[in-house]
């Protein structure tokens, strides 16, 4: 699929989805005489390299020509200041009860007006890397934020002759217009002193004000793209997907869903000691066709944490840019990065597409299984869910803990158990639509598992245990038995992590965990005016599950 860039004059009128107060205000700013269009990645690199505050390291980019960069390209570092994570409190989504377009467009008009005092850069990229799903996106950002522009072009697919030709072959779907995003990290409106991330999902536009952190631009773009996918027969996925082929040629395609820090990147890129022929689609953003189960990656590169990668780690070979990390001099006087979150939390880097040796942009094999990654001390390391309703509702109650990738409001407990439906805090449409999409996949034969990547009771679950569980599932050697007396909820014994239903204390722990899920689902009936309320069958399934747990 593709989106629409141009319109016949007779179609430029009220009633066309490409023209609304928000979108027209945002798009108009792109055409000012203070706007310079940047379409060349090598130029974007030079601009980022030369902007004030950039640290040009002495670390060469690996095979830079493969990424469209100069042959002498170096890893660039740029730091943002105090804020080093996304701020959910800044998000305003048109269509939700709290969003008043009349008031918001006043803010947009002011922000657009003040761009006249700055030189602005306009660039474009494709979101989606196959003719099945491609969206054209446009970003407008001020001079001095060349690193953000450069990172955005690296994170998504810059327009090249190869991808331009692919895009031409994509079939336009409906009247979906191109994405337009206006960003001014230096502009703060009095109504939004902590910044504004505004989304008009039906008209494919957004405005980011007071947002320096690159993750806001990455996820802001994906927020709109996932909405387009949802409207056009795809399940939007914030997670990783890979294929593992056994020696007998049998392929197993698995998707893992979790927030930053859940292990989704680690599990997606795990090599399994060469036991399988592993092919990676992506570790963060893709879409699954509800028609045939195939998947398309939305991004070519990887925006990864640097916390687990000390300087000499081999994975750092694939770095292109680094954000919110330190710099020091090595024994040869060379400028090198300081990682492991020594400087601050949530250090980040963009890694090239080459990081995954076997990478594809479309997974032709249909997906076999979905794994919800949770951090819930009541759960054993793995659970298998056979009922499509229970499988989908448990994804809607995906339990985790907050991470350094987020900027939290004052007073929020970092260690509290929270629920993030389908590990996707970037949804702009009613939650019930994701519930139905995932349920449809499970009804079509896709298996569902929960992997607890945190603690079981008070014992950490090592990543090696989790990877071993995945391998036993792929190999067909995992022996699942009923979890207690819950026949359609199964587990497999993992030494040191076996739930004891004779222990009243343990039963109480899992009882409390399920009650919290019910409280969360019940709260959706009120939050956002009930916009994210789930179907009765889902709510009833949770209540029934709680009753069954009480009877154990």
Can you annotate each of these PLM segments?
Residues 253-255, 271, 292-307, 460-478:
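Conserved, well-ordered active-site substructure
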Residues 244-275, 280:
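Glycine-rich phosphate-binding P-loop
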Residues 1-163:
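N-terminal accessory targeting/assembly segments
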Residues 175-232, 236:
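Charged, amphipathic alpha-helical linker segments immediately N-terminal to NTP-binding catalytic cores
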Residues 128, 212-215, 247-249, 261-262, ...:
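Short, glycine-/Ser/Thr-/acidic-enriched flexible segments
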Residues 202, 233-251:
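Phosphate-binding P-loop
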Residues 2-73, 78-80, 325-552:
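Conserved NTP phosphate-binding and transfer environment spanning the P-loop NTPase/kinase superfamily
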Residues 277-349:
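Conserved nucleotide-sensing/catalytic segment adjacent to the nucleotide-binding pocket
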